[in-house]
Amino acid sequence: MSTIIDKAKEIVEVNGMSDKITLLQGKMEEVVLPFDKVDIIISEWMGYFLLYESMLDTVLYARDKYLVKDGLIFPDKATIFMAGIEDGEYKEEKIGFWDNVWGFDYSPLKATAITEPLVDTVDIKAVVTDPSPVITLDLYTCTVADLAFRLPYELKARRSDFIHAVIAWFDIEFAACHKPIRFSTGPHTKYTHWKQTVFYLKDVLTVEEGETISGILENKPNEKNHRDLDISISYKLEANDMHRQASGESQYKMC
């Protein structure tokens, strides 16, 4: 069976580009390039929640070692967004399912199930709050250390509804194109492979239009497997009605 690089070589050859395109196989950190510097770096490094699988580390390594001064990176910016959603039916299916599994009580597994983010497509009608940008990474200047962060967010309710989860997605930018291009993986746009990442909350929040949920989003690579992510989301709803006020913090592992 041929590997993808074998097919790539065939494609280069049949298109008469062998004198212009050189293909190398190997890890970026290990491969030896036939030249000292490059003018452009192009990489599709994005994972679920933007940073899952830590592929951006390799792009930053290539940038620091090979990119010429004033060289170009595509894409060159990435922003993570958050929003609150109503998703009671699916939350009950995913979490409440463990209360009765063919007549048996599996409820001890609920605590584990809620720590696992769900990668799925979210209907725009389920989105209750305005989107909130949390972090923007500039690939010309960011470092590996910047990929672990603890940052505030604030979500403003568009309508009165319940909030069962928060979701995250990302936008990327190609600012150096002749006409700048922006590409989104949010619920407001067409389906993409990355979908959205759903984080179910322990509480069900009851919000009125105009109220805000504030909190902290923390992300860092898992210590045992740096391609996995340890994510923490705190939340606080200060409602006009004290009976609706709620706060908490949930831990998630993306693996």
Predicted regions and their residues:
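Class I SAM-binding transferase module
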Residues: 1-218, 222-255
